[in-house]
Amino acid sequence: MIKAIIGKIIGTRNDRWIKQYKKQVLTINALEPTYEKMSDDELQNAFEELKKRVRSTEKDLQEKTLLEVLPESFAITREASKRILKMCHFDVQLIGGMVLNDGKIAEMKTGEGKTLVATLAVALNALKGESVYVVTVNDYLAHRDSKEMEPLYHFLGYSVGTITASVRDDDERLEIYSKDIVYGTNNEFGFDYLRDNMKYSLEHKVQKSHAFAIVDEVDSILIDEARTPLIISGPVDRRMENYNKADEVAKSMQVEIDFTIDEKNRAILITEEGIKKAENLFGVDNLYKIENAALSHHLDQALKANYLFFIDKDYIVANNEVVIVDEFTGRLSEGRRFSEGLHQALEAKEGVSIKEESQTLADITFQNYFRMFSKLAGMTGTAQTEATEFLEIYNLEVVSIPTNLAIKRKDLNDLIYKSEKEKFDAVILKIKELHDKGQPVLVGTASIEKSETLHALLKKERIPHTVLNAKQHTKEAEIIKDAGLKGAVTIATNMAGRGVDIKLTDEIKELGGLYIIGTERHESRRIDNQLRGRSGRQGDPGTSQFYLSLEDNLLRIFGSDRIKGVMEKLGLKDGEHIESKLVTRAVENAQKKVENLHFESRKHLLEYDDVANEQRKSVYKFRDELLDVNYDISAKIAENREYALNQIFSKLKAFDHQNLSEEELLGLKNILKEDFNAHVSLEDLKKASPIENFVAEKLKSDYENKMKVLDSEQRSRIERIVYLQILDNAWREHLYTMDNLKTGINLRGYNQKDPLVEYKKESYNLFLEFIEDIKTEAIKTFSKIQFENEQDSSDAERYLDNFSEEREHESVTYRHEEALDEDLNVAMKAFAKTPKRNEPCPCQSGKKYKDCCAKSGPKKGLFAK
């Protein structure tokens, strides 16, 4: 109450921001007459002067200089837009541009010209000479926006490029990223960052800096997509028959007897009866024994697939494949797969071919990718409901920009029916009424399944209509553009053509504009607001109303009993509804509960990913150092050699290494031969004094003699490439181990331990192990390098010539590793292959290598006779 009173007196924080920006608008407008009088050449020269001024400033002071030149830059950009695009930035659009430049989120309603607003901040920040990224949700918008704005940017002396999934050629991508302004999707930018950190040359990295990015539809990308990490992966061996068996077992189990469903948390809890049934069907005595861990995991995923995930809602089956439907946009997520074996479980459920599970080679969340930018800004029509999350996670403030014209759309109260059938009957009646009148109507549904239901009902009533869901996503822009035509009836899932305007004729405006019908409240208020926002653009008339039922998921799972109680007291007859602000508020409270659950889920994901992110940054930084031709890789190898020898001598019993027994010396001799390909006699070891210096000098001289056939450039390149391969392989194994750790860490909660604290502690220890593994593996590999012909360097030349940089998402990444091993065999011959940490130990103990000889040395031992 007090806060509201103070707000009315001094204005809200948003009001105060807008007031400050309006002062700048006056300054910009005062410059307009000056630039209007200039010729094109004079205007371009004036902008070039701004570039020189900013770029001649010290880097640390460039942001300050940008603020100083902002009025001139905005005024020139506006004048150029008038001449080139025949579009003039409104005052509110100038405010939007300033919000973006300040690294904030500009909340602008549909039709307010966000694409044009972005040009102001883009043109200003590109003055620094670093590429500016404009991020969109799909290839269509990236291509459309870049092509529409390109003439303006060219006039200002900027080059423009567009990154889409269709750009496959590495050289072409490199060329596009060299442009001043780069448009692209969040997925492409994120994957390119991961691919950059799998490259073997700094010159081949496409993203040179992360200076400034403007994220269009920022709520969709930074909120809705935040729970889905970007992953580049390669296949991993799994027994495919386990998925089908687990699916059979899951289908035979009964709800409430063998398992219970927690719909709020989307979880399955197996009962004691269910465990016994599963053990009987799998033919095992204890489902939760370590050796049956894979079976219990497959069963968990099969139960989720069968009882929590539904066809035409969470996924569709197309071309013998299970394709995910994005829950927020309603679009098909081509190429994306559910993790942890869930996708395979869905494939088994639907009887399509099961694709093998994959192992992570590189991954990052959008949260951590976009937080790398020195300055980040965003645009959307709906951000205030998530303002807390934007601030807490991304340090982004949300500023609501006033509309250019007052909003005339009427947002009516929700109508609530007892059953879904009654609700849809009422929706059909309303559509028929509007269609007969000629007023266009856009009907929003929460899933493909519901859009198909509505389609069938309209077909039965012979009402012509168009359906837009994930199955027709290729026609999205065309369908949405036509949604404002006279008599048009359009059914759309959540996708509803974001970024595509629905323009109305004067005749349609006279009829009342576009009528929005929502057939279900989404879990997020923001998605509902997006649907409403399709109507009433640029001061157009319009109406929106939601039709709900007590059988809707949101009300059934999260809605309070209060709504149900009200309806029962009123004694509503079939087909009757209630309409009240009290009920609408209760629905919004249910939405807030779900939004909070999702926020906590995203925060939880980020807390875990932050741990991995620190490790990722450390590894990628070291990787860049290795790629630098000035980095002293030979010194790093010498350092690793010293470390490896210290590890060996630290295991020797005797404190005084000069008094080693013959048994110990023999053990040392064997280790030197097996691990370092160093041939020393027992007599030499006995005579050596001090023995550590003798061994160190022996390993060093062997290596230097081997590398004599190479010139300094060849040697440096060979050493860097081999070291990079060792690092990449170790990182891949580390990610695999981290995935396994994360999968089981929540079980620590049953032992009264905080899973996150345990994860941080164990992941830190794993990272230390990872670093040690690199050091020891590096020196072993370099010690075993042997050129086929030690009299010339042709093998090395052949290796360097054949070394391929081709990487293309998952499969190419995996193929590249196979090709790399083959090339290494052409140029070098290793005398022994050290098993990977998770491979079976060669001593045939039955344990993994990391739990056996990796710790204690080979079974014949350091002190073997």
Curated annotation (Swiss-Prot):
GO terms for cellular component: cell envelope Sec protein transport complex; cytoplasm; plasma membrane. Its EC number is 7.4.2.8. InterPro entries: Helicase_ATP-bd, Helicase_C-like, P-loop_NTPase, SEC_C_motif, SecA, SecA_CS, SecA_DEAD, SecA_motor_DEAD. PROSITE patterns: SECA, SECA_MOTOR_DEAD. It catalyses: ATP + H2O + cellular proteinSide 1 = ADP + phosphate + cellular proteinSide 2. It comes from the Bacteria. Pfam families: P-loop_SecA (PF21090), SEC-C (PF02810), SecA_DEAD (PF07517), SecA_PP_bind (PF01043), SecA_SW (PF07516). It is found in: Cell inner membrane; Cytoplasm. Gene3D superfamilies: Helical scaffold and wing domains of SecA, P-loop containing nucleotide triphosphate hydrolases, SecA, preprotein cross-linking domain. ATP binds at residues 93, 111-115, 501. One of its GO terms (biological process) is protein targeting. Belongs to the SecA family. Part of the Sec protein translocase complex. Interacts with the SecYEG preprotein conducting channel. Has a central role in coupling the hydrolysis of ATP to the transfer of proteins into and across the cell membrane, serving as an ATP-driven molecular motor driving the stepwise translocation of polypeptide chains across the membrane. This is Protein translocase subunit SecA. It comes from Helicobacter pylori (strain ATCC 700392 / 26695). The gene is secA.
